[in-house]
Amino acid sequence: MSYITVIDDKLYSSLRKLVGYSPLYLFNDKGDFVEVMKNSEFRFLIPSGYFSNSNVPLYGLTFSYGRNWMKDRQKIILPELYPIQRRVIEEIILQFSRKCKEKRPLYTTLHLACGFGKTVTASYLIGTHKKNAVVSVPNKLILKQWENSISSLKVSYYVSYEGVSKLLKVLTSKSFSILVVVDKHFSNKEFCELVYENYDVFILDEAHIYNLMNESIMTSFLCYYPPRICYFLTATPRQQNAVYCNSIINFIKFSPLQKILYVIRELYNEYTNPSIRAHVSQLQTTANKYHLYTEKALAEDIHRNKTIVDKIIETFKTNQGNRILVITKLRNHMIIIYNDLRKVLSDKVYLGDAQKKSTTDMIKELRTIDNFILVSTLHYAGTGLDIPNLDSLFICNTVMNSMQSEQVMGRICRDTGSSPTRSIYLFINTSIKEIKSLVGVFTQRFAQQATKLGFREVSQMA
């Protein structure tokens, strides 16, 4: 259970500063998740992770680290790490030794660049603790990636592909040193209690997905069943989440990669059709709050789509890009681009369709292929896609927030020892006049973020 207290002025100021002075929400002692107001007389639950920072007073609290040792810990084989990854481990050990002396919670956010190898690094940490561990991921698509990494430790593990009910039945007769689960498992109270009693290490993968100032499964778990040792893994941390994990290790990876950003500029005559006109009519309505109709109209821009397809084919045929990822926002746009590419490049083109069960096996196959084009959606491939050798990224959609942009760029920024060149292709123009300005603004915003991440911009006329 978290620390329960009335929040005085000093604590209130500290918590508000931590969340960037945005509204502060916590559970009160009645179990209600409410906004914390200054001088409130309610008692609130302060998450354990808040006390992980040495600048925070402990109010006489001490934290223990559990005794749930792996029964097969003598079998552990730690994975090989790159020098930069070993530096992260050394920094964590140094920080945790200080926390142990002060009896603080062993919590930290690992802010590591996309392509750093967070999964391998976290697996190494699990192995060094030698205590039972649970890894939580936001969706099933990432489970296989974790299984590949965890299995190398050579201790017992279970990856829960079939839901929490099946897992609880399995755990009645068997125990495992490591569980890898989807976050929805934590909606089950019995599972939360089991984890709290039997597992000491908790890994929250893709922590940026969760806004812990909102009431959610993860907010409840971290507050009412606080892990003894906890890692948040992310390339793009949320400031609001610092209340739950108030310690961070920030490593920027220096690499020899040559990063090039191509902004393709082609002028088009205006184009429309009945479907586009229907989408355009929704642009100024609340239905377009998340630019859904902007993307629907853009997906039907036949002139822009032709430019994209032609550039992909040219890049692939001239060996400027050998392992290409093509990203769309909408599924129908993905299929349009895929079909057009297949007409020319046939079996070199693959479809990353989240609706097909065979996609997971296909992704695994692509890790062993030297020349391919994968067409997928931002939802499927933007976070957690495990194909380390990608070298080129084509962005077909236009509207992304900064977190999504950085995540998708990370798909091609892994230093795998192959070709040192990494390329991004943006398409800044459209033939649909009603969205032309917006497409330009969002594309330029993406380009600005790419340059901050080390990409050198080159303008090209198609």
From Swiss-Prot:
A motif (DEAH box) lies at residues 205-208. DNA helicase which seems to act as a postreplicative transcription termination factor. Involved in ATP-dependent release of nascent RNA. Forms a stable complex with single-stranded DNA, and to a lesser extent RNA. It comes from the Viruses. Residues 99-255 form the Helicase ATP-binding domain. It comes from Fowlpox virus (strain NVSL) (FPV). Interacts with G2. Might be part of a transcription complex composed at least of G2, A18, and H5. One of its GO terms (molecular function) is hydrolase activity. Residues 308-459 form the Helicase C-terminal domain. It is found in: Virion. Pfam families: Helicase_C, ResIII. Keywords: ATP-binding, DNA-binding, Helicase, Hydrolase, Late protein, Nucleotide-binding, Transcription, Virion. This is Transcript termination protein A18. ATP binds at residues 112-119. The keyword ATP-binding applies. Its EC number is 3.6.4.-. Belongs to the helicase family. Poxviruses subfamily. PROSITE patterns: HELICASE_ATP_BIND_1 (PS51192), HELICASE_CTER (PS51194). One of its GO terms (cellular component) is virion component. SMART domains: DEXDc (SM00487).
